[in-house]
């Protein structure tokens, strides 16, 4: 089996003005597509690995031969991160979480606004390229960030919300103003999908 680039669940211009059409197009058809292509290339001749699910593959990198481990980590991580990221956004997104996710956030951070501040700090504070995440870890939620294309599954944590802070994710529109991109992100967060990811992880 070969890994494939998933279709976006909306048009390239659907997240305007938060994320511009050109960024979405390049990010999906070029950046994400390259991770998929390179992942498939790395797995050539490794039939046992090709038959694993993507999450299984990156959850257990020790099972990947050392000579392709870095390629699988970077490109498998990139494929997993972006496949989730697209689903976590919606043209009908924004607002606040409800239900169990809202309860968890309020219990842990005191308020949704305080959670937003801490998540934004993790995203802004990630030096260079990487991601900010809300994850489920042993039944509890926590905020973390990862370098490059590392995914929380590599540390045994389940991501339920993620934000790409690579410059390619925002530079065409926001240039060096990463904090502006981070604050705009809340306008497109798909809290229904976050809730679905949470219920799978909890």
Swiss-Prot record:
Major place of residence: cytoplasm
Swiss-Prot/TrEMBL keywords: Cytoplasm, Manganese, Metal-binding, Oxidoreductase, Phosphoprotein
E.C. no: 1.15.1.1
Domain of life of the source: Bacteria
Xref: InterPro entries: Mn/Fe_SOD, Mn/Fe_SOD_BS, Mn/Fe_SOD_C, Mn/Fe_SOD_N, Mn/Fe_SOD_N_sf, SOD_C_sf
Function as written in the Swiss-Prot or TrEMBL entry: Destroys superoxide anion radicals which are normally produced within the cells and which are toxic to biological systems. Active only in homodimeric state.
Cofactor: binding comment: Binds 1 Mn(2+) ion per subunit.
Family: Belongs to the iron/manganese superoxide dismutase family.
Post-translational modification Phosphothreonine, affected residues: 34, 70
Subcellular location: Cytoplasm
Cofactor(s) for this UniProt protein: Mn(2+)
The protein, known as: Superoxide dismutase [Mn]
Catalysed reaction equations from the record: 2 superoxide + 2 H(+) = H2O2 + O2
Gene Ontology cellular component annotations, sorted alphabetically: cytoplasm
Assembly: Homodimer; under aerobic conditions. Under anaerobic conditions it is a component of the so-called 'green protein' complex (GPC), which consists of at least two components, SodA and a nucleoside diphosphate kinase (NDK).
MF terms (GO), sorted A to Z: metal ion binding; superoxide dismutase activity
Binding residues annotated for Mn(2+), in chain numbering: 27, 82, 164, 168
């Amino acid at each position: 089996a070969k890994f494939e680039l998933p279709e976006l669940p909306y048009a390239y211009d659907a997240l305007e003005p938060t994320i511009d059409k050109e960024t979405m197009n390049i990010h999906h058809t070029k950046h994400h597509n390259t991770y998929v292509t390179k992942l498939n290339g790395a797995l050539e001749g490794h039939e046992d690995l090709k038959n694993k699910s993507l999450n299984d593959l990156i959850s257990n990198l020790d099972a990947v031969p050392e000579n392709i481990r870095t390629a699988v980590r970077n490109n498998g991580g990139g494929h997993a991160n972006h496949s989730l990221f697209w689903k976590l956004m919606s043209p009908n997104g924004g607002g606040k979480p409800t239900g169990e996710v809202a309860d968890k956030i309020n219990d842990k951070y005191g308020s949704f606004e305080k959670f937003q501040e801490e998540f934004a700090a993790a995203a802004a504070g990630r030096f260079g390229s990487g991601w900010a995440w809300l994850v489920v870890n042993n039944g509890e939620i926590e905020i973390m960030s990862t370098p490059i294309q590392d995914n929380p599954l590599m540390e045994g944590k389940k991501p339920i919300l993620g934000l790409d802070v690579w410059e390619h994710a925002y530079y065409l529109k926001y240039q060096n103003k990463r904090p502006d991109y981070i604050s705009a992100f809340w306008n497109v967060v798909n809290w229904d999908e976050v809730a679905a990811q949470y219920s799978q992880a909890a």
